[in-house]
């Protein structure tokens, strides 16, 4: 499915040279960076072979550290070790203090009420902290790819608002990165599994990370992912599994509840190791604080079953919000390291009635999807696989009376773009309007591509031409077209979304453009004829209404002359002679001028009846 691949002037001296791009999963607990090499998307590891980068930054007066080194300082220097900064992104200080009252950091408010974290390196905002994490990931990618990145795609939760998304973009710019796109995390996961090119329908993305749980219900339609509903629990994750198991081991080992921090750390490390082992083994031997014991998968499942049930309750709520049933879900994508737990996979499969997709490492799946998207956006895909574009390849418009296409956004317009145009009603008392969205370069509907239809209802019942409907076409950076129709006096509106690029190949686009040139003269003549026929129909419609209301203003002879002129116009309007139709319209206008003047006089007299000259 090809669209036009655009190379901007000056972007590259060698247009066929492969550009370097990366996908970044900027996570709450851990972050990853991935790229496409030799046609395969893969996450990039550090010098020690570790793919995950803990989303932790430790600040000192002389500098900072990111990742594993920073995480070791979390307990030693709490105030200067910032973790889970993603939770703070795009929030005011008041909001943060209300949501997270137990954070170990000291905050100050900036002039506009945004949070500033007090550290040994000075006052830092969440954008700066996120930028330091992004710099570390970018450095890993630059070293692995032996060159500077041309662009990145960064993933964000589907529920992130504009402020949180803008904060993420600002962090990337501060890190010196060119953001090709922000991509919703569930969409990235679906792309990693190739679901964007598969069958249409509903997809669930079950994301159980270390500290949070998110469920997203998506609808894939014509190559577009629409987020139907999101839900989850910001205080539920794999860390809770670890703490439950650590408490169980402590009880079994008879370790006092308030033992020292070293023993608590040892307990937690043992619990994490046991949890990981129980994903493959039926039982595991645990050694901690001089105690040795056996823990079975069954015992572990009993401990975590209530937490897994909580995630499924959130899934049920999200499905209800989306207005779909569990058995309507085509695929379930698993994201987050905690989805490796067998009980989680089992219960999710039972809930949705199908085995979830687990073939891609759930820690890496979001970053891999982002890398695939980045590779496309930076221009590395061959033409036959290009799905995203920087200009509109074919004009977008609406069907108007007479089967004509009114172009609203011409082809080769750069995106994102928004254009609006006003339309009006054709008939007296018209209270609804059918909006038919078209794509193509030809003048007639029959020669263009139909994209979508929707109706605007609730238009005030006014004379023809009295209502004014503003139709707005908006194409975002992903090539997603939104069309909104609004009646200006009442504000009533309707809208639809569609992806114009879906299902078109380069050859089809080229053919449509070539046809528009080959048939240009013929199309202009056809349009002129259609326009005259529409005008003839409008004139006759208006005349019939006037005669029905005020025929008494005419003598029999006058009425006959007008009827003859109207009959002649009706007859020639059935033919293909543009000039004859135009002359017949002019003749009707000439024969009805006196009638129109009398109707106007009558309307004025009615309006003035009962009023004095002074009142006027």
From Swiss-Prot:
<dbReference type="InterPro" id="IPR043129">
    <property type="entry name" value="ATPase_NBD"/>
</dbReference>
<dbReference type="GO" id="GO:0043531">
    <property type="term" value="F:ADP binding"/>
</dbReference>
<dbReference type="GO" id="GO:0005829">
    <property type="term" value="C:cytosol"/>
</dbReference>
<dbReference type="InterPro" id="IPR018181">
    <property type="entry name" value="Heat_shock_70_CS"/>
</dbReference>
<dbReference type="GO" id="GO:0042026">
    <property type="term" value="P:protein refolding"/>
</dbReference>
<dbReference type="GO" id="GO:0051082">
    <property type="term" value="F:unfolded protein binding"/>
</dbReference>
<protein>
    <recommendedName>
        <fullName>Chaperone protein HscA</fullName>
    </recommendedName>
</protein>
<keyword id="KW-0346">Stress response</keyword>
<dbReference type="GO" id="GO:0051085">
    <property type="term" value="P:chaperone cofactor-dependent protein refolding"/>
</dbReference>
<dbReference type="GO" id="GO:0016226">
    <property type="term" value="P:iron-sulfur cluster assembly"/>
</dbReference>
<dbReference type="InterPro" id="IPR029047">
    <property type="entry name" value="HSP70_peptide-bd_sf"/>
</dbReference>
<dbReference type="InterPro" id="IPR042039">
    <property type="entry name" value="HscA_NBD"/>
</dbReference>
<dbReference type="InterPro" id="IPR010236">
    <property type="entry name" value="ISC_FeS_clus_asmbl_HscA"/>
</dbReference>
<dbReference type="GO" id="GO:0005524">
    <property type="term" value="F:ATP binding"/>
</dbReference>
<dbReference type="InterPro" id="IPR013126">
    <property type="entry name" value="Hsp_70_fam"/>
</dbReference>
<dbReference type="GO" id="GO:0031072">
    <property type="term" value="F:heat shock protein binding"/>
</dbReference>
<dbReference type="GO" id="GO:0044183">
    <property type="term" value="F:protein folding chaperone"/>
</dbReference>
<dbReference type="GO" id="GO:0070417">
    <property type="term" value="P:cellular response to cold"/>
</dbReference>
<dbReference type="GO" id="GO:0140662">
    <property type="term" value="F:ATP-dependent protein folding chaperone"/>
</dbReference>
<dbReference type="InterPro" id="IPR029048">
    <property type="entry name" value="HSP70_C_sf"/>
</dbReference>
<keyword id="KW-0067">ATP-binding</keyword>
<dbReference type="GO" id="GO:0016887">
    <property type="term" value="F:ATP hydrolysis activity"/>
</dbReference>
<keyword id="KW-0547">Nucleotide-binding</keyword>
<comment type="similarity">
    <text>Belongs to the heat shock protein 70 family.</text>
</comment>
<keyword id="KW-0143">Chaperone</keyword>
<dbReference type="GO" id="GO:1990230">
    <property type="term" value="C:iron-sulfur cluster transfer complex"/>
</dbReference>
<dbReference type="Pfam" id="PF00012">
    <property type="entry name" value="HSP70"/>
</dbReference>
<comment type="function">
    <text>Chaperone involved in the maturation of iron-sulfur cluster-containing proteins. Has a low intrinsic ATPase activity which is markedly stimulated by HscB. Involved in the maturation of IscU.</text>
</comment>
């Amino acid at each position: 499915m090809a669209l036009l691949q655009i190379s901007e002037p000056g972007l590259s001296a060698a247009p066929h040279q492969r550009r370097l791009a990366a996908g970044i999963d900027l996570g709450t607990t851990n972050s990853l960076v991935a790229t496409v090499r030799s046609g395969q998307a893969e996450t990039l590891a550090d010098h020690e072979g570790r793919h995950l980068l803990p989303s932790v930054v430790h600040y000192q007066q002389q500098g900072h550290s990111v990742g594993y080194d920073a995480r070791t300082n979390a307990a030693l220097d709490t105030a200067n070790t910032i973790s889970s900064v993603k939770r703070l992104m795009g929030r005011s200080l008041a909001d943060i203090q209300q949501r997270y009252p137990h954070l170990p950091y000291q905050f100050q408010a900036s002039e506009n009420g945004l949070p500033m974290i007090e550290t040994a390196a000075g006052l830092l905002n969440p954008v700066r902290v996120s930028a330091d994490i992004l710099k570390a990931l970018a450095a890993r990618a630059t070293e692995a790819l032996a060159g500077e990145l041309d662009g990145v795609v960064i993933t964000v939760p589907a529920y992130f608002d504009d402020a949180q998304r803008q904060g993420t973009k600002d962090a990337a710019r501060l890190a010196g990165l060119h953001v090709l796109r922000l991509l919703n995390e569930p969409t990235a996961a679906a792309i990693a599994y190739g679901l964007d090119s598969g069958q249409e329908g509903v997809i669930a993305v079950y994301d159980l990370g270390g500290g949070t749980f998110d469920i997203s219900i998506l609808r894939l339609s014509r190559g577009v992912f629409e987020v139907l509903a999101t839900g989850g629990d910001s205080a539920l994750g794999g860390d809770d599994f670890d703490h439950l198991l650590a408490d169980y081991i402590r009880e079994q080992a008879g370790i006092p509840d308030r033992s020292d921090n070293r023993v608590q750390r040892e307990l937690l490390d043992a619990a994490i190791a046991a949890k990981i082992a129980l994903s493959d083994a039926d039982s595991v031997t645990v050694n901690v604080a001089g105690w040795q014991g056996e823990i079975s998968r069954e015992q572990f499942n009993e401990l975590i079953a209530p937490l897994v049930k909580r995630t499924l309750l959130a899934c049920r709520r999200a499905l209800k919000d989306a207005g779909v049933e569990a058995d309507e879900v085509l695929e379930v994508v698993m994201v987050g390291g905690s989805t490796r737990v067998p009980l989680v996979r089992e219960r999710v499969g039972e809930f949705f009635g199908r085995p979830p997709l687990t073939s891609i490492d759930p820690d890496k799946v979001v970053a891999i999807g982002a890398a695939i998207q980045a590779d496309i956006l930076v221009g590395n895909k061959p033409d036959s696989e290009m799905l995203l574009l920087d200009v509109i390849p074919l004009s977008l418009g609406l069907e108007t009376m007479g089967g004509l296409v009114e172009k609203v956004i011409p082809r080769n317009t750069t995106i994102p773009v928004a254009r609006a145009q006003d339309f009006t009603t054709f008939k007296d008392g018209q209270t609804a309007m059918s909006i038919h969205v078209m794509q193509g370069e030809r003048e007639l509907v029959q020669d263009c591509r139909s994209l979508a239809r929707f109706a605007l209802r609730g238009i005030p019942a006014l004379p023809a031409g009295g209502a004014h409907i503003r139709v707005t076409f908006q194409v975002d950076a992903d090539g997603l077209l939104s069309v909104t129709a609004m009646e200006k006096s009442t504000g009533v509106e309707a809208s639809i979304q569609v992806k114009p690029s879906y299902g078109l190949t380069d050859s089809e686009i080229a053919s449509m453009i070539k046809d528009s040139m080959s048939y240009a003269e013929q199309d202009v003549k056809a349009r002129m004829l259609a326009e005259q026929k529409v005008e003839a129909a409008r004139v006759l419609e208006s005349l019939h209404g006037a005669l029905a209301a005020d025929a008494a203003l005419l003598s029999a002879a006058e009425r006959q002359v007008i009827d003859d002129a109207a009959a002649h116009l009706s007859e020639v309007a059935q033919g293909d002679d543009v000039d004859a139709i135009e002359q017949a319209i002019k003749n009707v206008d000439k024969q009805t001028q006196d009638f129109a003047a009398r109707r106007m006089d009558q309307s004025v007299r009615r309006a003035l009846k009962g009023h004095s000259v002074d009142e006027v």
